[in-house]
């Protein structure tokens, strides 16, 4: 895999997966353009950072216009919720679609015109293995990630003949501090290490994956 000379937008960059993907992009010679709602003061010194609300379509368009040339988009921003599907409430339901779907939609709306103008680009989204089939306690989360997966397929069908590859990874549980805290009785050795998932994401953003379109790639670890 080689991302040399490629400018890659990474949303959710300040999170556990975002940090791993940023490190992988840099290791493969790419230039990360880091996006999140806010960044710690000492986060990724020397890298280009853009702090704004991805659910705000107008703000997203303004910030993407400032980024200049974009070769790849990695939509990592997202959130997770567990609870009875009948009892999540409007706020919880809306939050899952705002964080998992609206963030992706606003970035795609801003970035795809740039890629179409240059005749090339890659987009990698993050779905979920838990959304392939309905799971107990994951109603709103699974529904929102199902939208991500269907959007990935639709975007691929629309853009593949225009030089743009659109694919998604479908991880099981990612080994992050937050997940370890939320699931203290689980065995994290069976989860997906962020660095391993980052390598798959970077592969899909590389020229080595040029022939891959609309794939939903399971990354399950040992779970």
Question: What role is predicted for each listed range?
Answer:
Residues 76-82:
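Conserved NAD(P)H cofactor-binding loop of Rossmann-fold oxidoreductase domains
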Residues 128:
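Residue(s) in the substrate-gating loop at a strand-loop-helix junction
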